[in-house]
Design a protein with these regions (language model features):
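Surface-exposed, charge/polar-rich loops and edge strands
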Residues: 1-392
């Protein structure tokens, strides 16, 4: 049973750190190596200095991360709310030429083993968990909220979100992708919000949209700390909870690039260019597309797959998994970059996928299945550093 609770979070003091957009960052696992220096330059208080570390040695970056976080707290760059709070959160953005918003709330969620109540849709790998566990030991803090969706709708959550929007947010910024992030601090002196939300979430399954490795890390850290010190704040983790029925968060596709010999014949109808490919991929009704390099020319194809959605599962089942001679398989979010990788000869073909639907993802996991690796990209993602949950 998912249990939720308010927590006394840490917030940047805007008077000390200045521009909050320059002090915050995307989640650690979407910051490319060549972009890290840009975030470091943006502000001496950029959260990436803690989230990814600045040391050179195998352990130095973790030690430095903990020291930097403690120094910022001592200096007053990060200040505590002073009492437990719920943190309503909103992201406004343009998607498919329309304005959208996704709302949720950041809370502490009690840790439970993976199962029917806390549901993964992708597998975790040992390396990232080991990295994040060493980082969590050093920092003793949840720096970014794990993103989870529930089937909803929740009247208690919607009522809370509607109410706080009547006042200015406590923190607000626009990030490098043009997404507007707004956060409120709701201390809920009477406890009624917490009680109503907790009662509703007792019967909900939380689908992890982003943060599988962070959740697995929190489970491992809890076992360590319980063995050493018993129950404590390590029994929970910070999450952004979004009602997918009301908010309909976009799930962007992650395209596949393939190095293969021989290059197979791909079924489909030929179209002119990438623009027509993207127009074809308007819905997740088993539509797919491909670009193949033949005799130095790019050939663009569109078609439909057989089977059950989501399309990414059908693509792997029908075309990718049985394909002989695959030397390399890559994952690319930008379709133009995937096309360029084929054009330059780095890969021989690319498969393009439509945006997924949350209900398709949920249907797979509710039947006990999991999606292929790198199947979904829930976007936008909550900003790291908007609120921090300390464990000490």
């Amino acid at each position: 049973v998912p249990t939720i609770a308010p927590f006394d979070g840490l917030l940047y003091d805007a008077a000390r750190v200045g521009d909050l957009a320059a002090a915050t960052a995307p989640p650690y696992d979407v910051i490319l190596p060549h972009d890290l220096a840009r975030f470091h330059r943006a502000s001496p208080h950029n959260i990436a200095r803690v989230d990814l570390g600045v040391g050179e040695g195998p352990h130095e970056k973790y030690t430095q991360a903990g020291e930097i976080l403690r120094r910022w707290r001592d200096e007053g760059a990060l200040v505590g709310v002073g009492k437990p709070a719920i943190y309503p959160y909103e992201m406004r953005f343009a998607y498919r030429a329309k304005e959208h918003r996704v709302r949720g709330m950041i809370v502490e969620v009690g840790l439970e083993p993976w199962g029917r109540q806390i549901v993964p849709h992708e597998r975790t790998m040992a390396g990232p968990v080991e990295d994040r566990l060493a980082h969590l030991r050093a920092t003793a803090a949840n720096l970014s909220a794990i993103y989870a969706v529930c089937a909803g709708p929740s009247e208690a959550q919607t009522s809370l979100l509607d109410r706080v929007e009547s006042r200015p947010p406590d923190r607000e910024l626009t990030d490098e992708e043009g997404v507007r992030h707004r956060l409120w601090v709701e201390t809920d002196a009477g406890g009624t919000d917490t009680e109503a939300l907790a009662a509703w979430y007792r019967d909900q399954a939380l689908l992890i949209a982003d943060g599988h490795h962070r959740y697995q890390t929190a489970l491992a850290h809890r076992e360590e700390m319980r063995s050493a010190r018993g129950p404590g704040p390590w029994d929970g983790v910070m999450m952004l909870l979004v009602d997918s029925a009301s908010e309909n968060p976009p799930v962007l596709p992650i395209h596949r690039v393939v190095a293969v010999d021989p290059v197979p014949e791909i079924p489909g109808d030929r179209v002119r260019d990438l623009g027509e490919v993207l127009a074809w991929l308007a819905d997740d009704d088993l539509r797919f597309a491909a670009v193949v390099r033949r005799n130095g020319e790019l050939v663009h194809l569109v078609g439909r797959l057989e089977g059950e959605p989501p399309t990414v599962s059908a693509l792997h089942r029908n075309l990718l998994d049985p394909m002989p001679g695959v030397r390399d398989l890559g994952f690319v979010q930008d379709p133009a970059l995937a096309e360029e990788m084929v054009h330059t000869g780095r890969f021989d073909l690319a498969f393009f996928l439509p945006p997924a639907r949350v209900e398709y993802v949920r249907a797979v996991v509710e039947q006990g299945g999991q999606l292929p690796q790198k199947s979904t990209y829930f976007w936008p993602k909550p900003r790291t550093g908007m609120v921090i949950r300390p464990l000490s």
